[in-house]
Regions:
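Tubulin/FtsZ superfamily GTPase core signature
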Residues: 1-186
Length: 186
């Protein structure tokens, strides 16, 4: 039994590459996206923060949540926090929109120059995209791995309305059926 499952479909990963990308480079790009996803989740609880997120926060958002979605976004320039938030909620890792999510956890990572207004702007982009009564938990961390002037936002959205849960579940089950049929042919 699981509380939540994050689905990262291969065909969505393929949408991040050009047609001319070699298979070797395509797998490297896809591997990097998956690595960032895993790092994004582990960084939420292991990286000391200005505003900390801990395992209890993740449990609060993920427990009995069903399907969950995850996105990561990077931003630079004048609107870097808003751009990172928009990129995270429209990430190639997201099978469907985060609209309607009733559980949201997000982390804003930046350097010493990250401002409270940027945190507020990013939070506004994310909170306006989910259920108005959603349980929202966020944290902020200082990340030395980021380039100067860069902001990184990791979003996990869960507890979707039943119609969205069914859509995500059916997408996952359809993939399993295709994979099972392919295995039977070998």
């Amino acid at each position: 039994v699981v509380d939540a499952i994050i689905i990262i479909p291969n065909d969505r990963l393929l949408s991040t590459i050009d047609k001319d990308t070699s298979a070797r480079n395509a797998f490297a790009i896809c591997d990097n996206i998956l690595k960032e996803a895993v790092e994004g989740i582990s960084d939420l609880i292991t990286m000391p923060g200005i505003i900390n997120i801990d395992f209890a926060d993740i449990r609060a958002v993920m427990q009995d949540a069903g399907a969950a979605l995850m996105g990561i976004g990077l931003g630079q320039g004048d609107k870097r926090a808003e751009d990172a938030a928009r990129a995270a909620i429209s990430s190639p890792l997201l099978e469907i929109s985060i609209n309607g999510a009733k559980g949201v956890l997000f982390s804003i990572a930046g350097g010493d120059d990250l401002t409270m207004f940027e945190i507020q702007d990013a939070a506004k982009v994310i909170t306006e995209s989910v259920d108005p009564n959603a349980r929202i938990i966020f944290g902020t961390v200082h990340d030395d791995k980021l380039k100067k002037g860069e902001v990184k936002i990791t979003v996990i959205a869960s507890s979707f309305p039943e119609n969205v849960q069914k859509k995500v579940t059916s997408l996952f089950q359809n993939r399993e059926l295709v994979e099972d049929e392919d295995k039977g042919k070998n």
